[in-house]
């Protein structure tokens, strides 16, 4: 099986996701509103050799410094770099609290974000004490409009409140702005990562032309048709 979705995924993938979900619950306890899966695992095009695992978690209140430290330690443990290839996969996750979701804001603020691009920074800052400044400012991410739109379209609730009860509708203009931001990034990395970049651009074109909210793979099929 070269690609699959959540219902058909390998035990090792399901176990990795479940371990992170349980780690979020153990760390955040009553503050955790829900954990949501999106991306290739919900579109049915997860490639165990290439794909990452996309998660989004929502909390009732903003995260404390200690919660952020524990989350960084959790993800440094259970996410893995893209290289060398591994049966466990890289994890990308954003955490937002309810006031960052409602009322809707664009670009969307968030409390915490992890991806393998940040592994070195988190490792260094946990060691040198810089983590104690993680609450000094709030960051925003234009990609969250796209992530939340996809969650509303075909996301999976792994824990907590249902998707419809948590996430507001995303204005189409904000979703388009998020897609265009992704397109600019894809063009920037075209030479270094042509496959990813072309697939990303196909997904953008599918929505801009036909209003299709889809995975990168489905965007490529749309382009071929």
What do these predicted ranges mean?
Residues 29-31, 49, 84-89:
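Short helix-terminating capping/connector loops at secondary-structure junctions
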Residues 172-225:
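Extended, basic/helix-rich recognition subdomains
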Residues 2-8, 73-189:
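Conserved NTP/Mg2+-binding pocket subregion across the NTase superfamily
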Residues 39, 43-77, 90-97:
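Catalytic metal-binding acidic patch
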Residues 1-36, 66-68:
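Helical scaffold of the NTase/Pol beta-like nucleotidyltransferase catalytic core
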Residues 5-12, 59, 63, 189-193, ...:
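Conserved aromatic-histidine-acidic binding/catalytic patches
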Residues 42, 100-101, 203-206:
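Short, solvent-exposed loop/turn segments at secondary-structure junctions
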